Amino acid sequence: MKSWFRTEDGWAVWLGLILVLLALPSAFGVDLLGWAAKPEVWTSPGQSIAPLSKAYAGYGRAVHVLATTGFVLALVGLGAAWMRFDLVEFMPRFAALFVISCVCYTLGHNAYIAATPDKRAGLGLDWSLGLTGE
């Protein structure tokens, strides 16, 4: 049987478990990941990113984006290092892929794409595709 620490699938499970364990305390009022960035349905680019928790809203959007990117790079880098990947080669490529995917995900939250019919009026829209951001 292969070790769960030597395969990408195994590390996907471990990293997912780490994220679940970090998110679980929020059910009891302890928010460990509220600083992370999340896309919002937006009509202007300045509204596109917000922290997971409103308690962290005082920090700039760039802080949330950089912290989230750094956190994900650290987690994935841990797995890549354990599997003996060449980090000099792996990390910039993963970072580029992560940033591109985040940009696409955020663009998909544009109100004309993502706003559902019940949210259009609140966003000042007459129409939208109603596809949601997911």
Q: Over which residues does each language-model region extend?
A:
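Helical membrane-embedded segments and adjacent short helical loop/helix-boundary regions
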Residues: K2-E134
